[in-house]
Curated annotation (Swiss-Prot):
Pfam families: AIRS, AIRS_C. It catalyses: 2-formamido-N(1)-(5-O-phospho-beta-D-ribosyl)acetamidine + ATP = 5-amino-1-(5-phospho-beta-D-ribosyl)imidazole + ADP + phosphate + H(+). The gene is purM. Belongs to the AIR synthase family. GO terms for molecular function: ATP binding; phosphoribosylamine-glycine ligase activity; phosphoribosylformylglycinamidine cyclo-ligase activity. One of its GO terms (biological process) is adenine biosynthetic process. PANTHER family: TRIFUNCTIONAL PURINE BIOSYNTHETIC PROTEIN ADENOSINE-3, TRIFUNCTIONAL PURINE BIOSYNTHETIC PROTEIN ADENOSINE-3-RELATED. This is Phosphoribosylformylglycinamidine cyclo-ligase.
Amino acid sequence: MSGNNSSLSYKDAGVDIDAGNALVDRIKGAVKRTRRPEVMGGIGGFGALCELPTKYKQPVLVSGTDGVGTKLRLALDMNKHDTIGIDLVAMCVNDLIVQGAEPLFFLDYYATGKLDVDTAADVVSGIADGCVQAGCALIGGETAEMPGMYEGEDYDVAGFCVGVVEKEDVIDGTKVAAGDALIAVGSSGPHSNGYSLIRKILEVSGADKNEELAGRTIGEHLLEPTKIYIKSALKMIEKHDIHAISHITGGGFWENIPRVLPEGTKAVIDGNSWEWPIIFKWLQEKGNVETHEMYRTFNCGVGLVVALPKDQADAAVALLKEEGENAWVIGEIAQAEANEEQVEIN
């Protein structure tokens, strides 16, 4: 028995169960607005239940998990937490749509050194916003208060999503062939990738996040939420013979496009077919970043690259524009020689 007669509690160790319960009460409304008819029960159980939609004959489940990287540090520095949850959902669901999957449900993990209920509620509200945009249900999550693991009220988030696609409709890149057209679907900014380089550029250049650029502050440009493509992409998939979709995330063009290309093919991109959004021009100038490195780190204004038959490209672009997307023909698929790079940007 310790010489100290005072009784210790979990709260004395830095874990506030009451704060956790208060957070659950705060987020119930946000969770409710994401509900889908397939969801069984509410939050708070040991597991979350979800039926498969009855319209699928041979349903295939598609799963994904992701985070938002060091964009979180920027959100913490700017004390703005209500959109980072949208980023989290986007990074997960956009990875599902590349295989043609409709997102069904989403779960989140929120870890912090000291739970601030207001901050966590803002994050979860953003997650709910993202789920509404994606059409998936927020069915559960975990909040972990871990004193000594994180500095103060710093936090990290991770997301987990499951979607469904008809077995015969899985998009896996096997149909990609020379002569296919490539369509770009525009991004909303850097999305959630390249933020370690972005923060280094801010540090080295001494740039002020409150500096104005095209009517918005640099900070606002950089915290712009990742675009969620689910509803527009599902309509495109329904109407057109989509051969492959690449989500341009970490690794940029060079790493992500080859992931969906069969051996012996390459993507030939017309670098003059679009103008980089101003935030990318600013980052390149302030950081003196080479163009190749820009394409390797950032999406440079392109969130998705879609391969489809050439004779369907114009109609697909028109459909995407009707759905509010910025879309254009960005290139084509060509034959590649052995050991040749699978992405060529002219």
